[in-house]
Amino acid sequence: DAMLHGIDGIDLVSFRVLGGALLFWIASFFTKREHIPTKDIIKMAGAGIFGLVCNQCCYTIGLSLTSPSNSSIMTTSMPIFAMILSFLILKEPITWKKAIGVLMGCSGACIIILTSATAGNAKVGNIWGDLLCISAQLSFALYLALFKPLVQKYSLFTVNKWMFTWATLFIWPFTIGHVSDIPFAQVPMSTWWETGYVIFFGTFLGYICMMIGQKTLRPTVVSVYNYVQPLVSVTVSVIVGLAVFKGMQAIAAILIFSGVWLVVKSKSKNDIDKHDHSLAYEKRHA
């Protein structure tokens, strides 16, 4: 709602990265201080580029060009990218269970999105907007696959404060002129509260929870929970009386939860390595 009352997408991205940087720096003062070599601080710049700058900017600009339903459908590509990149970068196997789970989740999410589209949101799609939205998903999938070792090495507050700091340094030189044009006096107080909600809950707490998962879960598992977002959106809309739950959406919910379960239960590289070592041990002692 904030984006309809004086704060557009680029402004919101700018506030999110700056607000996130400030909150994570404040939080870091209450956690154990960690020594970070210069090379890792530079790596965190890369994490900020892929996990925040490209992801947020590409999606925000893409959303302004294409339709909401198209942009939502594009987000279903992220677990597919994460699965492929995890195979190429982290050597995580693409098992049948994992592949079927990702496709089931993707199908369920698409059903939710398409059955939730209304004539009031019938903006025409745009190929460049769609490509930007896909680029945003590829960017975040790269972040999940490339920077998992970095996330596991340091505390989530250390990683996030540097990621958001770098993102602020990359984004604000290009957006400060746009932000300064906001008619601050005309923006309703409710809009500032909504922006604050996005910064604190959607960004600060959101990245804390995401990184806790990233530390312990495989990139494909982290990304597949992306399919739950449209289901949560529809459920909340039904609860507040803005939508009606449809039969096809119930089927979609089953597909999403089944897909997530299959991906979570699929074997990781460590599982397969342990199994191979166990077989080798049994053969040696047979």
Set out the residue ranges of the language-model regions.
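Juxtamembrane C-cap of transmembrane helices in multi-pass membrane transport proteins
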Residues: D1-G6, G19, Q56-T66, M74, ...
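Juxtamembrane helix-entry segments on the extracytoplasmic side of multipass membrane proteins
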Residues: G6-S14, I36-I42, L114-L142, I176-G196, ...
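Transmembrane alpha-helices of multi-pass small-molecule transport proteins
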Residues: L4-C54, F81, S139-L146, K161-S180, ...
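Specific transmembrane alpha-helical segments of multi-pass solute transporters/efflux pumps
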Residues: W25-T75, I111, I199-L217
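Alpha-helical transmembrane segments of compact multi-pass small-molecule transporters, enriched
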Residues: G19-L23, M74-L88, L103, W166-I171, ...
